[in-house]
Curated annotation (Swiss-Prot):
Name of protein: Catalase-peroxidase 1
Alphabetical list of InterPro entries matching this protein: Catalase_peroxidase, Haem_peroxidase, Haem_peroxidase_sf, Peroxidases_AS
Signal sequence region: 1-22
Gene Ontology terms describing biological process: cellular response to hydrogen peroxide; hydrogen peroxide catabolic process
Organism: Shewanella oneidensis (strain ATCC 700550 / JCM 31522 / CIP 106686 / LMG 19005 / NCIMB 14063 / MR-1)
Length: 728
């Protein structure tokens, strides 16, 4: 069937299909709470068998054989996408870099950990142009090793091997990145409605003088880092330096790492802009089926090799773009540079009066040479005073530069992989790095009878059910499944900065920690504070469940260590501070975003589903764990009893709900007009949202008392063990 015939036919599905252009619920009701971020990545989208373990599969992989195949690929140029100077290293490094470079510290999202570069929007971002070709070049290797090697791991490994093949001694490589199977729904990339929109356009990510919206790190929609031509495409290295500094800081990089990564990334490979951007076809997501997932295809010629167009800039940064050397700093610091336009019309910097021997051999004709080029960000490494000092040192000490870069590259490509306990493979570095949030291992075991005895001592310590539960929750709730930071393991709630966070109620926290420390000191057997905190929560929940008439044992696995202040980078933990916690009915202040939206975001980071979120909220309310002891949402007369009262009263039509202030409501008896309870938006949303109400009704039913307790315990245990990667 040709396109003409297809366009004339009517939809064969009665009333139309909802796979493409039909309106969905969010189109009709844009203010409705969208729970999709809690429903992504479920087993229905995962083609792997239910018992498949990527960890086990990767551990059976012959990594040396994979690396040998990658080494061979680097110089095996293909006619359909020829390698620059016969080496794919620059392309593979850019692919790996752009996979890892979407990471941002504010929420831990982005990064290389899921293979998300295969999906929209990343696969079609302007800054990722022609990386579809890099992944197609890797397909024979992925096909060969199958499920033992994820795309996420292969992409980073390819970048590592590319550097090694060009002479760099890398710091190491760890596997363990499991693939996802559809685009992520939880990542906010910005609110702009067009690619590469200038910062003064509507829906800009900038406010004030040039304040970049959190949690974003990139300066434009569709870019990984900064605009290579300058701020909003206007060359000015000093202004660009500020963009670079903010962007890399939001990726957890300091100035030295920033200079090293910029220089090391541009020591090899080249920019492509020897043509017109308007000659390129759509990005992969916008192409037709015959393109088979490829995009940016040249409509007026092959558009490959020396005629390729990617960023629009044209040229290499160094004289020898297929070898690791110090040529970047040699050229940058020894020549004066002037602004020029590339053949595609992009701004770039070129050297003045360059020596013939310092020019770059043409990709297409070895008899020709061209000027090297620098982006505005490269010029920032020379013009900005602090970056200049670092550049000078790297230039004078190439070995130091190589070491700093290798470590920074490892950090860039492993930052979102989590602690070292998640690392897989024979090339994992032995050195503990502070950005990995190290936790000491424990050397004790607890048998069942000892755990029972400890629970009794915790319940007899004078601490209340709410104090024990709230402390365990506060310790564990920092976990982020995005970059696997935070959690109860390490008991960093006792250390700065967590011990002083207002969300942790420092005065109450210190009271609890003092009691737990005294209990720890009295024990004949060593037990970590981290384990005691979690066990205290378990003991309290068992007591509350028993009071509700349900006998249950909360699962507990000892083995958590206690981190020290020397193991803790205080500054890096600042971003984990909770500014809201729906589970404890707390907001640090009023925000533009509605509390229920923030609840979804936090729940998604913790790895919770919608029904797990629901049952935890209901349980935490009746246990009396609200921040500061407030009574909002505590729909029960039996505080401290793990009952389903929250849901019973929420769904009871004997009550009406009236707003009495910002994020505050009264629950009023319809017959008498008496105020029975107070509530917040995150309480009432479980009765107002149609999906959440369905879950609330399940737990409000007369036959749900035991189910509620069992489901609460299961969800609680999931949160407490979220960072126990040793149990995987």
């Amino acid at each position: 069937m040709d396109k003409t015939q297809r366009s004339q036919g009517k939809c064969p599905v009665m009333h139309g299909a909802n796979s493409a252009v039909a309106s969905n619920n969010m189109d009709w009701w844009p203010k409705a709470l969208n729970l999709d971020i809690l429903h992504q990545h479920d087993q229905k989208t995962d083609p792997m068998d239910p018992n498949f373990s990527y960890r086990d599969a990767f551990n059976s992989l012959d990594l040396a054989a994979v690396k040998q195949d990658l080494h061979s690929l680097m110089t095996d140029s293909q006619d359909w996408w020829p390698a620059d100077w016969g080496h794919y290293g620059g392309l593979m490094i850019r692919m790996a870099w752009h996979s890892a470079g979407t990471y941002r510290i504010a929420d831990g999202r982005g990064g290389a950990g899921t293979g998300n570069q295969r999906f929209a929007p990343l696969n079609s971002w302007p800054d990722n142009a022609n990386l579809d070709k890099a992944r197609r070049l890797l397909w024979p290797i992925k096909k060969k090793y199958g499920n033992k090697l994820s795309w996420a791991d292969l992409i980073i490994l390819a970048g590592n091997v590319a550097y090694e093949s060009m002479g760099l001694k890398t710091f190491g490589f760890a596997g363990g990145r499991a693939d996802i199977w559809h685009p992520e729904k939880d990542i906010y990339w910005g609110s702009e409605k067009q690619w590469l929109a200038p910062s003064d356009n509507p829906n800009s990510r900038y406010s004030g003088a040039r304040d970049l919206e959190n949690p974003l790190a990139a300066v434009m929609m569709g870019l990984i880092y900064v605009n290579p031509e300058g701020v909003d495409g206007k060359p000015d290295p000093l202004r660009t330096a500020q963009d670079v500094r903010i962007t890399f800081a939001r990726m957890a990089m300091d100035d030295e790492e920033t200079v090293a990564l910029t220089a090391g990334g541009h020591t090899v490979g080249k920019c492509h802009g020897n043509g017109k951007a308007q000659d390129l076809g759509p990005e992969p997501e916008g192409e037709d089926v015959e393109a088979q997932g490829l995009g940016w295809l040249n409509k007026k010629g092959r558009g490959v090799g020396c005629d390729a167009v990617t960023s629009g800039l044209e040229g290499a940064w160094t004289t020898h773009p297929t070898q690791w050397d110090n040529g970047y700093f040699y050229l940058l610091l020894n020549y004066d540079w002037e602004l020029k336009k590339s053949p595609a019309g992009a701004w770039q910097w070129e050297p003045i009066n360059i020596k013939e021997e310092d020019k770059v051999i043409s990709v297409g004709d070895p008899a020709k040479k061209f000027n090297p080029i620098m982006t505005d960000a490269d010029m920032a490494m020379k013009i900005d005073p602090e970056y200049r000092k670092i550049s000078e040192r790297f230039y004078q000490d190439p070995a130091y530069f190589s070491e700093v870069f290798a470590r920074a590259w490892f950090k860039l490509t492993h930052r979102d992989l989590g602690p070292k306990s998640r690392y897989l493979g024979p090339e994992v570095p032995s050195e503990e790095l502070i950005w990995q949030d190290p936790i000491p291992s424990v050397d004790y075991r607890l048998v069942a009878s000892e755990i029972v005895e400890l629970k009794a001592k915790l319940l007899a310590s004078g601490l209340s059910v709410s104090e024990l539960v709230a402390t365990a929750w506060d310790s564990a709730r920092t976990f982020r499944g995005s970059d696997f930071r935070g959690g109860a393991n390490g008991a960093r709630i006792r250390l700065a900065p967590q011990k002083d966070w207002s969300g942790n109620e420092p005065e109450r926290l210190q009271k609890v920690l003092k009691v737990l420390s005294a209990l720890q000191a009295s024990l004949s057997k060593k037990v970590s504070i981290a384990d005691l905190i979690v066990l205290g929560g378990a003991a309290a929940i068992e007591k509350a469940a028993h009071a509700a008439g349900v006998n249950i044992t909360v699962p507990f696995m000892p083995g958590r260590g206690d981190a020290t202040k020397e193991m803790t980078d205080v500054e890096s933990f600042v971003v984990l501070e909770p500014l809201h916690d729906a589970y404890r009915n707390w907001l640090k202040q009023d925000y533009v975003v509605q509390p229920e939206e923030m609840m979804l975001d936090r729940s998604q980071l913790m790895g919770l589903t919608a029904h797990e979120m629901t049952v935890l909220i209901g349980g935490m309310r009746v246990l009396g764990t609200n921040h500061g002891g407030t009574r909002h949402g505590v729909f029960t007369d039996k505080v401290g009893v793990l009952s389903n009262d929250f849901f019973v009263n929420l769904t009871d039509m004997a009550y009406s709900w009236k707003p009495v202030g910002t994020n505050l409501y009264e629950v009023v008896e319809r017959k008498t007009g008496t105020v029975k309870w107070t509530a917040t938006r995150v309480d009432l949303v479980f009765g107002s949202n149609s999906v959440l109400r369905v879950y609330a009704e399940v737990y409000a039913q007369d036959d749900a008392k035991e189910k509620f307790v069992h489901d609460f315990v299961a969800a609680w245990t999931k949160v407490m063990n979220a960072d126990r990667f040793d149990l995987a």
